[in-house]
């Protein structure tokens, strides 16, 4: 029998990751405020580490096939810290897409299955974008 309880460490990780996204979003809203973006990046990375562990985080970010995405992501963080938030965020976003692009179809399908959010995902402009990211399955499973 499998244990599906979420440990305290993973709960803290989810909270830190959520706060990281919130601070990054707030930093973008505040016209690319470097301090908020830096705090958000730090919280995001620490949260991911708490969720999957130190060893798996290092393996994930420094896997050979994901090295380009990692260099862009961490390089973008450094560029933000050095005071060029626009260029840093562009590099970070590109690196984020390269690193986490494999998870996008699963995330899109999850959003399509949530009752309140699914109606938003089927709006005309949003549906075309999401269909390119993750085409709908033709077969009911």
From Swiss-Prot:
Compartment(s) of residence: Golgi apparatus membrane; Golgi apparatus, cis-Golgi network
GO biological process, one term: retrograde transport, endosome to Golgi
Lumenal side: 33, 92-93
Side Cytoplasmic, residues: 1-11, 55-70, 115-141
Outcome recorded upon mutating residue 131 to A: In yad83; significantly enlarged AMsh glial cells
Membrane-protein topology: Multi-pass membrane protein
Family note: Belongs to the GOT1 family.
Its biological purpose: May be involved in fusion of ER-derived transport vesicles with the Golgi complex. Involved in regulating AMsh glial cell size, acting by modulating the E3 ubiquitin ligase rnf-145/RNF145, probably by mediating the translocation of rnf-145 from the cis-Golgi to the trans-Golgi during development.
Keyword Protein transport: yes
Null allele phenotype: RNAi-mediated knockdown causes embryonic lethality, but about 10% of animals survive to early adulthood. Significantly enlarged AMsh glial cells.
GO cellular component annotations of the record: cis-Golgi network; cytosol; endoplasmic reticulum; Golgi membrane; membrane
Protein name: Probable Golgi transport protein 1
Keywords attached to this entry: Golgi apparatus, Membrane, Protein transport, Transmembrane, Transmembrane helix, Transport
Cysteine disulfide links: none
Annotated transmembrane regions: 12-32, 34-54, 71-91, 94-114
Main location: Golgi
């Amino acid at each position: 029998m499998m244990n599906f309880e979420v440990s305290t460490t993973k709960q803290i990780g989810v909270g830190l990751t959520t706060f990281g996204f919130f601070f990054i979003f707030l930093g973008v809203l505040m016209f690319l405020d470097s301090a908020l973006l830096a705090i958000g990046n730090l919280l995001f990375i620490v949260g991911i580490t708490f969720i999957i562990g130190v060893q798996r985080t290092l393996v994930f970010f420094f896997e050979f096939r994901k090295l380009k995405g990692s260099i862009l992501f961490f390089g973008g963080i450094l560029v933000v810290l050095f005071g060029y938030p626009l260029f840093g965020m562009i590099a970070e976003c590109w690196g984020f897409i390269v690193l986490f692009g494999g998870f996008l179809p699963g995330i899109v399908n999850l959003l399509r299955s949530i009752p309140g959010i699914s109606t938003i995902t089927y709006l005309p402009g949003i549906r075309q974008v999401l269909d390119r990211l993750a085409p709908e399955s033709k077969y009911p499973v």
